[in-house]
Amino acid sequence: MAMSDKKDVVLIGAGVLSTTFGSMLKTIAPDWDIHLYERLDRPGIESSNERNNAGTGHAALCELNYTVQQPDGSIDIEKAKEINEQFEISKQFWGHLVKSGEIQNPKEFINPLPHISFVRGKNNVKFLKDRYEAMKQFPMFDNIEYTEDIEEMRKWIPLMMKGREDKGYMAASKIDEGTDVNYGELTRKMAQNLKNSPNVEVQYKHEVVDFERLSNGKWSVKIKNLNNGQVFEHQTDYVFIGAGGGAIPLLQKTGIPESKHLGGFPISGQFIACTNPQVIEQHDAKVYGKEPPGTPPMTVPHLDTRYIDGERTLLFGPFANVGPKFLKHGSNLDLFKSIKPYNITTLLASAVKNLPLIKYSFDQVIMTKEGCMNHLRTFYPEARDEDWQVYTAGKRVQVIKDTEENGKGFIQFGTEVVNSEDHSVIALLGESPGASTSVSVALEVLEKNFPEYAKDWEPKIKKMIPSYGESLIDDVQLMRKIRKQTSKDLELGFYNKAK
């Protein structure tokens, strides 16, 4: 790359998305100057943190909201294929970072864990069986197992079967090649690698407070050093806003037209965590149920084995809790400051359109620990209050926007890339399955905003992500080859012995 092509990039936020994009960019454009600013004192403290992340290892293996029943009764698995491919892309990039020595000890951030779906009730059992039949036919999911036999379920999920009798309708499906991912640890590893890289500057306790567009087309970014209160400005070619819940207010400060007619509604996640090691040891899976009728996808409960600080833990949730902060370490004025003359009708229209969601949120806010425990007992009937404690996880800011297709006040689920017309400002908005698909999101950012570099960068990207430019959905042989390679690179051990 010629020196005349050298650019300067500012990354805002040291979460999984910024550190992923930064890690990728420093490899494909090593001469570019990258400056990462994080207002907290270390990386991965907000939504990427392992105690704040609402769901880990999203691969559409057990999350039932990615497989939707159609009016004719058939099951559409297209979204599940897409999510699974994106997770396979993420695993390739992480494997590359391990193989290249940029990060070490993959077991500190990813571990094998069965992914299981569990349902009760006649209609739900039929849905799960139909889903199994649809997924079994597709090579990406042909290792799925299904049972309605309670004795088999006792082997898969012994803790959840305690106290259950062999009556009523119950079913479960299982894919053993699932994982638990500690995105906090992964983020910390990538941030440290960035800090050790040439042409990269990582600054903690530095808050981006404003932007100004300059006549030369660059941006002047105003940054406050929270250690001493000093404010300075940095000129840059590109601004990347990967600040989680803080992305919308920062995007609004740029003043770009694309920041208008969108807003956000903050939702906290609450979990109940098991404190009894004897109970924790009896569960070894990520188990998802089905959302209650008439509730949004975010309401899907799950009982998860997780690895935090090298120890096995057990969490159940999430339960929503509404508050005005956009970040866990944010301000109670965040929501109110984000309401502008240009987006107030968007937010009001959303409120009118989404009364069931508002009712659900209110019901969740007033839920006590007893209510949480009652939900848990639908998964684990013998759960005792004294073995569990409630804790507040991270924030998600649900994006609300106007679209031609859905009109004003449409709630956008998932992760979305927003950029200025000239591609100098790029912001990542949204939530689940954000962290799990972070590498695909970073690739989307590159493809949408740096098309003039695509030809030069493609060979470097393919070295990091061998399936880049090809379909793991359509190419079965490639998909199986990639899975075996990432299992080896990440020390998952999925294919070490024949089934």
Curated annotation (Swiss-Prot):
<comment type="similarity">
    <text>Belongs to the MQO family.</text>
</comment>
<dbReference type="InterPro" id="IPR036188">
    <property type="entry name" value="FAD/NAD-bd_sf"/>
</dbReference>
<keyword id="KW-0560">Oxidoreductase</keyword>
<keyword id="KW-0274">FAD</keyword>
<keyword id="KW-0816">Tricarboxylic acid cycle</keyword>
<keyword id="KW-0285">Flavoprotein</keyword>
<dbReference type="InterPro" id="IPR006231">
    <property type="entry name" value="MQO"/>
</dbReference>
<protein>
    <recommendedName>
        <fullName>Probable malate:quinone oxidoreductase 4</fullName>
        <ecNumber>1.1.5.4</ecNumber>
    </recommendedName>
</protein>
<dbReference type="GO" id="GO:0006099">
    <property type="term" value="P:tricarboxylic acid cycle"/>
</dbReference>
<dbReference type="GO" id="GO:0047545">
    <property type="term" value="F:2-hydroxyglutarate dehydrogenase activity"/>
</dbReference>
<dbReference type="GO" id="GO:0008924">
    <property type="term" value="F:L-malate dehydrogenase (quinone) activity"/>
</dbReference>
<dbReference type="Pfam" id="PF06039">
    <property type="entry name" value="Mqo"/>
</dbReference>
<comment type="pathway">
    <text>Carbohydrate metabolism; tricarboxylic acid cycle; oxaloacetate from (S)-malate (quinone route): step 1/1.</text>
</comment>
